[in-house]
């Protein structure tokens, strides 16, 4: 018998905790829509109690998503659970995910509570969450370093209290596949009422074993895996959704389960998350990397030409890679533009939004002879960033650069609708431009990353620039794209500055009193 494996995506919550990967409300909604097209079972939209912005983002996702279940994270605190319940009240299907630490070191030093008190708080939290929804997930934080007898005790208690999913996290990425898989199997066997709940795992990648640990758990009875697109997450990241899904699909001889994921949406969703967060996909990344289905060796190439199955264990088309590329240009009409966007999984909320992005497309088409899918994705990302309430806007940029001379840049920006113009010189055109912007803003930030990637091939290709700024412990990424790399750099810098200027008071889910 083949059971269904539930795919729980936490890109919007745990993935966003990657330094610099913060997303706006509208960006989260766009990713949530992509996850829904991917047919993800559960979308963890955020931690509503973290900040007003997080609450609004979870609320917006809950109001938008119709098919996937929308989940909100909450500590085992009444105020957190109530906040999650309020954010999720408009969801078609809601889940509250509550947790408390269960390892001796966490109970003693972080919670300063006895094991009995921890069980009491966990049971109380689950019962309160059940007042808002009949779908409640419970996680014993730092389960990998918890005593197994205590884990059995607290998990049995929360099932009796109404928990329908039990999630076992490897919080610090310390577990090893054989050991972790056997632990899941023992918990299922030892807990008397384990048949009344779905067992789930949430693995971190500190030792590069997140996917392996998750799959080992599936082999021992886990029927939900928590994962993220591209493996995005804190520190070394989380288990990569695309790798979990394709491993289970490809090795049906090993795994006694299946997922309902629409795998042809994987690559599009991966590119969207990468574009929004500014975290590039490494070329040799499994499934979604540019080289994942490339063959350099002559022997391999010869084999693939004769029969793809000789060196390919899965089809590139099955995960969304396509050789059928529709190329648009300046003569392409609005209908062709809309149709291609729909084929890429991009829907517009209104005719006004469609018209706005189409006008950007026409401007780009005047600069480029051919517009590829990657150009369209960049247009959407840029339009989404500028749709927010930005305090700083780039108005004009003029650069003077001659051989043997120091480059100069003149920049005009709007700050809270007040126009400002400044000039600066630098070691190059990009350096001069960014210095000119900084001279008008005085943000006193540190530029810790500057990278350029060509979106497509050709000398008229758009360049996509990612910058990372740090100030006062905050880290943000900014993105910009243009056929002129200097303008793309200025756009990226302004995008990052706007994120820094946005007010934020966020509580980390693993920090705070109980």
Swiss-Prot record:
It is found in: Cytoplasm. It is an enzyme of class 2 (transferase). Keywords: Amino-acid biosynthesis, Branched-chain amino acid biosynthesis, Cytoplasm, Leucine biosynthesis, Manganese, Metal-binding, Transferase. Its cofactor is Mn(2+). Its EC number is 2.3.3.13. It comes from Methylococcus capsulatus (strain ATCC 33009 / NCIMB 11132 / Bath). Residues 5-267 form the Pyruvate carboxyltransferase domain. NCBIfam families: leuA_bact, PRK00915.1-3, PRK00915.1-4. It comes from the Bacteria. Its main location: cytoplasm. Homodimer. GO terms for molecular function: 2-isopropylmalate synthase activity; acetyl-CoA C-acetyltransferase activity; manganese ion binding. Belongs to the alpha-IPM synthase/homocitrate synthase family. LeuA type 1 subfamily. It catalyses: 3-methyl-2-oxobutanoate + acetyl-CoA + H2O = (2S)-2-isopropylmalate + CoA + H(+). Catalyzes the condensation of the acetyl group of acetyl-CoA with 3-methyl-2-oxobutanoate (2-ketoisovalerate) to form 3-carboxy-3-hydroxy-4-methylpentanoate (2-isopropylmalate). Pathway: Amino-acid biosynthesis; L-leucine biosynthesis; L-leucine from 3-methyl-2-oxobutanoate: step 1/4. The keyword Secreted does not apply. One of its GO terms (cellular component) is cytosol. The keyword Transcription does not apply. This is 2-isopropylmalate synthase.
């Amino acid at each position: 018998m083949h059971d269904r494996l539930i795919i729980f995506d936490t890109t919007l919550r745990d993935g966003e905790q990657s330094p610099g990967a913060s997303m706006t409300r509208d960006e989260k909604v766009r990713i949530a829509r992509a996850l829904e097209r991917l047919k993800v079972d559960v979308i963890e939209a955020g931690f509503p109690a973290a900040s007003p912005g997080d609450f609004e983002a979870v609320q917006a996702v809950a109001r938008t998503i119709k098919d996937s279940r929308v989940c909100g994270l909450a500590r085992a605190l009444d105020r957190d659970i109530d906040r999650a319940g309020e954010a999720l009240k408009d969801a078609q299907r809601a889940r509250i995910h509550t947790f408390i630490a269960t390892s001796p070191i966490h109970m003693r030093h972080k919670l300063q509570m006895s094991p009995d008190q921890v069980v009491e708080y966990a049971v109380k939290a689950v019962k309160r969450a059940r007042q808002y929804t009949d779908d409640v997930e419970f996680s014993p934080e730092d389960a990998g370093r918890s005593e197994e007898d205590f884990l059995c005790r607290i998990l049995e208690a929360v099932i009796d209290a109404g928990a329908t999913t039990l999630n076992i996290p490897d919080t610090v990425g310390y577990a090893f596949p054989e050991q972790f898989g056997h632990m899941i199997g023992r918990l299922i066997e030892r807990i008397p009422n384990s048949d009344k709940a779905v067992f789930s795992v949430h693995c971190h990648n500190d030792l590069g074993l997140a996917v392996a640990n998750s799959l080992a758990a599936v082999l021992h009875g886990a029927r939900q895996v928590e994962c993220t697109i591209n493996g995005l997450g804190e520190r070394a990241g989380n288990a990569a959704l695309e790798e979990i899904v394709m491993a289970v699909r490809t090795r049906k001889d090993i795994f006694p389960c299946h997922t309902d994921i629409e795998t042809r949406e994987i690559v599009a969703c991966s590119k969207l998350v990468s574009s929004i967060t500014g975290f590039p996909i490494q070329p040799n990344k499994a499934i979604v990397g540019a080289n994942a289905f490339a063959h350099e060796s002559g022997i391999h190439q010869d084999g693939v030409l004769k029969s793809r199955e000789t060196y390919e264990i899965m089809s590139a088309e099955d995960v969304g890679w396509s050789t059928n590329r529709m190329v648009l240009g300046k003569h392409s009409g609005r209908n062709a533009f809309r149709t291609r966007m729909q084929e890429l999984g991009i829907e517009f909320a209104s005719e006004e939004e469609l018209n706005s992005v189409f006008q950007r497309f026409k401007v780009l088409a005047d600069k480029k002879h051919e517009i590829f899918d990657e150009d369209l994705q960049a247009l959407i990302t840029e339009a989404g960033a500028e749709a927010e309430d930005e305090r700083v806007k780039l108005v004009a940029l003029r650069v003077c650069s001659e051989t043997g001379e120091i480059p100069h840049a003149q920049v005009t920006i709007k700050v809270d609708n007040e126009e400002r113009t400044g000039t600066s010189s630098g070691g190059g055109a990009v350096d001069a431009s960014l210095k000119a912007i900084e001279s008008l803003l005085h943000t006193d930030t540190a530029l810790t990353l500057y990278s350029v990637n060509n979106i497509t091939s050709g000398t008229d290709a758009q360049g996509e620039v990612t910058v990372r700024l740090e100030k006062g412990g905050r880290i943000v990424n900014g993105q910009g794209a243009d056929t002129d790399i200097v303008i793309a750099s200025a756009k990226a810098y302004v995008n990052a500055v706007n994120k820094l200027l946005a007010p934020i008071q966020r509580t980390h889910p693993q920090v705070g009193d109980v």
